[in-house]
A protein has these predicted regions:
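Hydrophobic anchor at the beta1->P-loop junction of P-loop NTPases
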Residues: 6
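Conserved lysine of the Walker
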Residues: 14
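Hydrophobic positions on the alpha1 helix immediately C-terminal to the Walker A/P-loop
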Residues: 17
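Conserved nucleotide-sensing/catalytic segment adjacent to the nucleotide-binding pocket
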Residues: 38-81
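Interdomain motor-coupling "hinge/lid" segment immediately C-terminal to the ATP-binding subdomain
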Residues: 91-205
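Accessory nucleic acid-recognition modules appended to NTPase machines
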Residues: 156, 160-334
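Domain-level recognition of nuclease-like catalytic cores that cleave nucleotide substrates
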Residues: 376-399
Length: 399
């Protein structure tokens, strides 16, 4: 490929990662005049040693086509790195970049990346068909602290109170200015605040546009579902929201798949910040902590699976069977399924769900048997059940 595009939420480490690989760079967010130069004379900002980083390229979206033509003219690999904290609205004149520009999604750090997880059990190891054994050092309260802090690289060396303040400031910036700057459409900050709070309350759930509209409507008034949809699209554009799509798979039974996505903010720390939930409050509310823990696990699974080009989905059918995470590796034609349980009391229920999915629902003649089945927990010990289902604490999960 002639270029790589690094996308992800503000503060997840895109620029630092790109600078580590770039031979030269230009940062469009440093000066309005630099943006103007990029729009008027894009070839000028492409000059420099390669790979050449163009940081926050979306501030001058018209350079996309110019960059594509430059790649065609040079006929060389690894010429440019683009990084951006929002995705400009596509227009008919902008080429997709297919065949020329590879896309890389970055996210806040998984626990193994921040050093909170030992990483002693990898996803690959789970698929080897052998029993697992490990011990997590993370207590129930430690997990609550990790969820509230979030996985932002800039928070590694600061205390939890400061990390919470960062997450609150992050949310405030989204409410007040980030959406308008990225999307170019005026919005109501209070409406965005209510929407993100609603998403935070419904984190890891399949909340509908109608239910969110009802939840965020001020007293005595209403909000149209299409308005909610527009705001959700905008939040997706700035990567503050990352929906978890439903798995589309061939079934052997008469069950019908549900197709609604689950809602997740970019990091569980943002959900806690939006609702003013600190470590003590989260730890004392097991029900909501379970939702936040699931979101933290999904964040980590997305990161870990992406190392092998895997993608994460969820499963639900019309009989009520749900599985929290399906990892699909399209290049290897493999899949795996994970349930998420904060405590140990529902591990048996999770095991039954996983076995029912693998043995009764999925047409294994078409998609194959699962590489592994696992229950990701907030407990202490990793082990393998007689059924072959693994029980794996998040505090030992790694690459």
């Amino acid at each position: 490929m002639g270029a790589v595009l690094i996308e992800g939420p503000r503060g997840c480490g895109k620029t630092s990662t790109a600078l580590a690989k770039a031979a030269s760079h230009v940062r469009l967010d440093k000066s309005p005049s630099m943006v103007q130069l990029a729009e008027l004379n894009p070839s000028e900002i492409m000059k420099g040693d390669t790979p050449r980083l163009i940081d926050e390229w979306q501030l001058a979206p018209s350079i996309w086509n110019a960059l594509r033509h430059e790649i065609d003219d040079r006929q060389q690999r690894g010429q440019f790195i683009l990084s951006g904290s929002s995705s400009p609205t596509m227009d008919k004149s902008r080429h997709s970049g297919a065949g020329r520009i590879a896309r890389l999604r970055m996210r806040p750090m998984a626990l193994v990346e921040s050093g909170a997880s030992s990483g002693s059990i990898s996803l690959n190891q789970l698929g080897m068909g052998e029993s697992v054994s490990a011990t997590s050092e993370l207590s129930y309260r430690d997990l609550a602290e990790q969820a509230v802090r979030g996985g932002w690289p800039g928070l590694l060396e600061i205390g939890t109170r400061q990390a919470i303040a960062f997450n609150r400031s992050y949310c405030e910036n989204i409410y007040e200015s980030e959406l308008e700057a990225a999307v170019g459409v005026r919005h109501n900050p209070d409406a965005v605040r209510r929407l993100i709070s609603s998403v935070a309350r419904n984190i890891s759930s399949e909340a509908t546009l109608q239910s969110i509209a009802k939840d965020i409507a001020p007293a005595g008034s209403s909000v149209e579902p299409k308005t909610v949809a527009a705001y959700i699209d905008a939040l997706n554009q700035v990567f503050a929201l990352e929906e978890l799509p439903a798995w589309s798979v061939s079934l052997r039974s008469r069950s019908r798949l549900r197709t609604s996505s689950k809602l997740h903010l970019a990091d569980p720390g943002l959900a806690c910040a939006a609702l003013g939930v600190g470590v003590d409050r989260l730890a004392s509310d097991p029900e909501y902590f379970g939702q936040v823990f699931e979101s933290m696990v999904i964040r980590d699974l997305r990161t870990l699976a992406s190392a092998e080009f895997g993608r994460v989905y969820h499963y639900r059918d019309n009989t009520g069977l749900e599985v929290d995470a399906i990892i699909e590796y399209p290049e290897d034609s493999k899949w795996a399924a994970c349930e998420v349980k904060l405590g140990s009391s529902r591990i048996h229920e999770a095991e039954e769900n996983l076995l029912k999915l693998a043995n009764d629902r999925v047409d294994v003649e078409k998609v194959g048997k699962p590489a592994f089945l696992a229950v990701i927990t907030g407990t202490e010990y990793a082990y393998t059940l007689p059924s072959g289902v693994h029980v794996v604490p998040l505090g030992v999960l790694g690459y």
